[in-house]
Amino acid sequence: MASVGLQFQASAGDADPQSRPLLLLGQLQHLHRVPWSHVRGKLQPRVTEELWQAALATLNPNPTDSCPLYLNCATVAALPSRVSRHNSPSAAHFITRLVRTCLPPGTHRCILMVCEQTEVFASACALARAFPLFTHRSGASRRAEKRTVMVEFFLVGQDNGPVEVSTLQCLTNATEGVRLAARIVDTPCNEMNTDIFLEEIIQVGKELGITPTIIRDEQLKTKGFGGIYGVGKAALHPPALAILSHTPDGATQTIAWVGKGIVYDTGGLSIKGKTTMPGMKRDCGGAAAVLGAFRAAIKQGFKDNLHAVFCLAENAVGPNATRPDDIHLLYSGKTVEINNTDAEGRLVLADGVSYACKDLGADIIVDMATLTGAQGIATGKYHAAVLTNSAEWEAACVKAGRKCGDLVHPLVYCPELHFSEFTSAVADMKNSVADRDNSPSSCAGLFIASHIGFDWPGVWVHLDIAAPVHAGERATGFGVALLLALFGRASEDPLLNLVSPLDCEVDAQEGDNMGRDSKRRRLV
C-alpha cells in the first residue's frame, strides 16, 4: 500500500465500482442509517438496492464482519457495535484492520466512512495508518501511476450535515502528520540517521517558516548535555538536540513536547541479542510523533507557545562508547552512574526536559518515547502508558486517547516508593533500576522527572509508546493524534477543539496536594 495518496473530500462523487472500487465502512447500526439514495451512484449499475439491503442483513460483526457486494470491486464492512470503556468509541484499531483486509485493489479507490461527528478525527487517523509511505519493494518503484484513495464521511447522529471544509483540512494535516511519523519510524538507520532526521526537522521548519535551533556533537558536551552526548558519541553520525519553536502573539502559556529520537539502539556495550535488536530502528518513534504533531498543530493554528524538542542519537558500539560504570553530568546538573547502556532513552530525555524547563520556561512538558519493553507488559500493544504528576492530566490523557484512537492507560505514580531503585553510592543516581520486577516502566519515567524535580510546580506528562508505535512490521504513527487531541483546546481548529479532553473529572483527594500552581488545569 505504499505511495498511496489519501484525499478527504466532502463528496467523492459517483462512479461505477468496476472503475473505482469502493469500501463502505461503519458500525452496523450506522450503516443501516445510510439511505440508498446516497450510495446508489457509487454502486450502480453493479449493485441494486435489494442486494445492498441483503448484504446489510447478513452482517454479524463479532467483533467485525464484511460482505462483498460486487466481485472484488465493492465491499461493505461492519465495525464492532459496542466497545469497552478502555477502547475508543470509534473502534479505530478495527478500522485500520478492515481497510487493510477489505479495501478492494485498484489505482483509484474510494472509502465511504459512516460515523458520528465525534468519531471523524479518530476514524481518519485510523484510515491513514493503513497506507504507509515507506517501501523499498522493487515493484513499487516501477509503478508509473500513483494510486489514490478518496475518503468521504457520511455523518449520522445529531451533527449529520456535510463535513465542513475546515474539517477536511484538519484531517488532511493530521493524517499527513501520522504518515510522516510512520515513514520516519519505518525507515532504517542507514537512511534515517541523525543527520537525515535533522533534515526532516529542517524541512518541516521551512514549511512552517521556523528556523530550528540545533546543538550537536561537541557543542552538546560543551554546553553540558551529558546525557545526549554520552549516548550518541560513539556513532558515525553525531548526536543532536533540535528545537522547533512557535511563539505567537497573545500566548498565555508555554508548552514543550520532548521526543526521544534514538535512530538505532544496539543497546550500546550492554548490547542487545540477535532476536531483540531487529526493529530498533523504531526507537525514534517519540521524536517522529512530536514532529508530525507539531507540523499539524501549527498548520491548524496554535494559540500558545509550543516548542518541539528532539533528542537525537544513535546508541552505537565503538571505541568511544559509554561504558557501564561511567558517570555522566546531565544538563540538570545531576550526575548519573551508568549501570546499563541499554537504558539510554531516559538519558537523552532527561537532558531534553531539563532544557525545556530551564531554557524554554515551559509550564507544561510532555515527553514521548519508546522507552521500555515493560510498557507492553504493563498496558499492552494498543495502549500507551502515561505517567504524570497530575491526576487531572492523567485523566485527560486517557480521555484524549479514547477520542482520537491513540489509546492510553495510567502507570503508578509514586516516586517516594520507586525512585530508590536508582540509588548510587558514587553519583546522584544510576540509570537503571535495581529490581526489574518493581514497576520498571514507572521507574523509567520517574528517572526523567527527577531531572526537573518532583517538586516542580508545572505539569509533567510522560508517554511510553514502545508497543503501540508499531503493529506487526509496520509503524503506526502513534502519538500524533494523541498530542493533537490532548492540546486541542489550544488550537484554533474546531475539530481539534471537539476532541479535546475538556472537563476531566478526578478525585480531588487523589490529585495535586504538593502545592501546584493553577497553570496545570488550563487545557483540560
Swiss-Prot record:
GO biological process, one term: proteolysis
InterPro entries xrefs: Leucine_aapep/pepB (IPR011356), NPEPL1_N (IPR041417), Peptidase_M17_C (IPR000819)
GO cellular component: cytoplasm
Location of the active site: K272, R346
Gene behind the chain: Npepl1
Residues engaged in binding Zn(2+) 2: K260, D265, D283, E344
Pfam families per the UniProt record, alphabetical: Pdase_M17_N2, Peptidase_M17
Reported function: Probably catalyzes the removal of unsubstituted N-terminal amino acids from various peptides.
Family listed: Belongs to the peptidase M17 family.
Binding site for Zn(2+) 1: D265, D342, E344
Stored PROSITE patterns: CYTOSOL_AP
Necessary cofactors: Zn(2+); Mn(2+)
Keyword vocabulary terms for this entry: Aminopeptidase, Hydrolase, Manganese, Metal-binding, Protease, Zinc
EC number annotated for this UniProt entry: 3.4.11.-
A GO MF term: metalloaminopeptidase activity
Protein's name in the database: Probable aminopeptidase NPEPL1
